Amino acid sequence: MELSATVLIIALTVLTSYLAWQKPNLMERWMFTPYQIQKKNQWDRFILSGFIHKDGTHLLFNMFTFYFFGRVVESFLMIKFGQTVGIGMYLLFYVGAIVIADIPTYFKHQSHSYYRALGASGGVAATVFGSIILMPLSDICLFGLLCLPGFALGVLFLIYSLVQSKKGGDGINHDAHLYGALFGIAFILIVSPQSALNFVDQIKSFRLF
């Protein structure tokens, strides 16, 4: 595994998740709890909650996904802006996605003392969709069985997240997935408007068979 900002983020997330598993008081303090943020001004929860996970399965799924898609976005930003600036922008991209993806959830649940969330969903969704804008025709395979071009899976994912967000009740913060994805798309298009034209050109060239 090549050392990169993506790998360092994964290593940090594994470490902080492990610490939270070992110390329940840390887990409780770092979780995204809008009520506590509003009541005690614990704004650091916006970031800290993105670096802890519920269990090993949750951590493995998020970091496995992040590793493959994060490298695409990281490489793109380094090529476009140079190594130092590119890495800085990549870190801003990832942390910014975690924070911004949770803002709608904060306003929705700031009066609900029972609500808690954790995980890197916003950051991971942003890297997945940032990668899709850059490489929309690259196949994404689900469980090694069903493979779809990135843009097609992206559309399905956005529809699913929107529907489930309105429905609620499954314990998953679908808002973070949805807004993280939108942040990833917007970020890439802002720093590289040409990516929009490249995306359209690639979609036009798509052939089902």
State what each model feature region is.
Residues M1-F209:
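A detector for small-residue-rich transmembrane helices and their helix-helix packing motifs
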